[in-house]
Amino acid sequence: MQIDQLDIQGRRIRYAVRRGSPARTPLLFLNGLGANIELAQPFIDALAEPTVVIFDVPGVGGSPTPAMPYRPSTIARLAARLLDHLGFDEVDVLGVSWGGVIAQQFALQHARRCRRLVLAATAPGLVMVPGRPSVLLKMLTPRRYVDPSHAHRVAGDIYGGMFRRESALVEKTLRHVRFSSRLGYYMQLAALVGWTSVPWLASVRQPTLIMTGIDDPMVPVINARFMRWLIPHARLEILDCGHLFLITLAEQSAHIVEAFLTEPQQQRQAAFSRPLSRRMQ
C-alpha cells in the first residue's frame, strides 16, 4: 500500500491506497475502534482486484488527535473529501465494527457515491443488543493496544473465535498496531453516544452484505439479523469465527466480499428477493 498524508477540513489525515484494477469500482475501507491502517493489511492483501482506500481516523494511528470531538457524520464527510482528492466518485464501502457505523452513515449521507455496502461485525448503534457487561468494560480502555500481557489476557474475551485458543494471533496482531493516544480512542467512543441508524436503515437502497462472526462477544449475531431485517436489499453471512474474522479468516472473508462486489445485477436481485418473514432467519 502507498501511504501518504493530507490536510482535510483542518485535520491532518494519514491515508493509504492499494492500487488495483481500473475496471473495478474502488473500495473504501472504514476501520474499527483504535485500529490503524496496518491492521487491515491481511484482508486488503487477500482482495484480488479492487483499488482500496483506507485512512486513520483523527486520533488513531498516524492521524493527530483533534482538538474537538466529532460525530460519525464528520468522519463520513471527511471520507468523502478524501475520495474527492483521489478522484474517486462512486465507491463500494466496507465498514468493520466502529467503522461499520461510519459506513452506514456514509451510505445515508453520500448515497449517490455508495454503489454497494458491506457491514462487518457491526451494529445499528444505540438500539442494539450489546455484549456482556464484562466484555464492554474491557473495551472501554485501549490498554490491549499498548500492554501485550494484558492483550493476551483479554483477547479471547473481547474478540472470541480463534483468539480464544490461539495466543500467537495476539502477537501477530500487535505487530501491526500503531497506537496514537488514549484521547483519540475515547473520542471514537464518544462519537457513538446517542447515534443510531435504526430510524433510517430501511431507506438504504444499496445492495448490502452483512457479515458477522458466530462467536462475537462484542457484537452478538442478533444485531446482524436485525440489520438484515431492516435493510431492504441485504443478505447475511455468518462466519465460524469471532469479531475479527476479517483478520483471522482473511482469505475466506475476502472471497465472500469479492463475490458480492462482482455479482451481476440480475443475480443480486434474485438473491435479495426473499419473503419478509425470512429476513430474521
For the regions a protein language model found, what residue spans apply to each?
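Conserved HGGG/HGGXW glycine-rich cap/lid loop of the alpha/beta-hydrolase fold
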Residues: 11-62
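Active-site loop/oxyanion-hole signature of alpha/beta-hydrolase fold enzymes
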Residues: 54-94
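Gly/Ala-rich beta-loop-alpha elbow adjacent to hydrolase catalytic centers
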Residues: 95, 99, 103
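Flexible "cap/lid" loop of the alpha/beta hydrolase fold
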Residues: 104, 108, 114-144
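Conserved alpha/beta-hydrolase catalytic His-Asp/Glu region
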Residues: 128, 148-200
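Short beta-strand/loop motif that positions the catalytic acidic residue
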Residues: 204, 210-212, 216
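Conserved alpha/beta-hydrolase "acid-adjacent" motif
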Residues: 217-223
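Catalytic histidine-centered segment of alpha/beta-hydrolase-like enzymes
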Residues: 241-254
